Amino acid sequence: TQLKERRRIDFIIVDSAGKTTDEGIKKLCLVSDAVIVPTSLTQNDLLVTYQTVADLAPARTLNPRLRIIILPNRIHSATNIYTVRETLKNLDAIILPVMVPQKNLFVNFSTLDAENEYQPIAQAILNNLA
């Protein structure tokens, strides 16, 4: 409730480390506009993502404006967005039309390149928060 009263805050970002069953995370969902769930397309990540969406369902009942947004993450460059959307289509959530690409560690150290590369992802997230 203190977060609701302090209207000077535009966005609060919390990294739950995948612990959506945590009581603190559940309480945050009651006053949040959106929860962003990053996922890769591995079998394990998909199972966790489906469980995360299910875990957050009760918060949606109490907070009808809560949007669950899926961010495709660590996606191989040869994978197209149609394949991603097809894989995630049964989730009761918004699937962002962008993907965070899989990266080879230590290949690209430029922060400017990273900023340009991730700008469309940030914009897609902001578009879903408006």
Question: Which residues fall in each region the model found?
Answer:
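Short beta->alpha connector loops
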Residues: 1, 17-21, 41-42, 76-78
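Catalytic phosphate/metal-binding cores of nucleic-acid and nucleotide-processing enzymes, i.e., regions
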Residues: 1-12, 32-34, 44, 54-62, ...
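Switch II (G3) loop of P-loop NTPases
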Residues: 5-25
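Conserved beta-strand segments of the P-loop GTPase G domain that flank and frequently precede/overlap
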Residues: 13-15, 36-40, 69-73
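Inter-motif core of Ras-like GTPase G domains
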Residues: 22-43
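Conserved C-terminal guanine-recognition region of P-loop GTPase G domains, centered on the G4
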Residues: 47-74
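Beta-strand-loop-alpha "switch" segments that mediate conformational coupling across diverse proteins
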Residues: 74-113
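NTP-binding/hydrolysis catalytic cores, primarily Walker-type P-loop NTPases
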Residues: 111-130
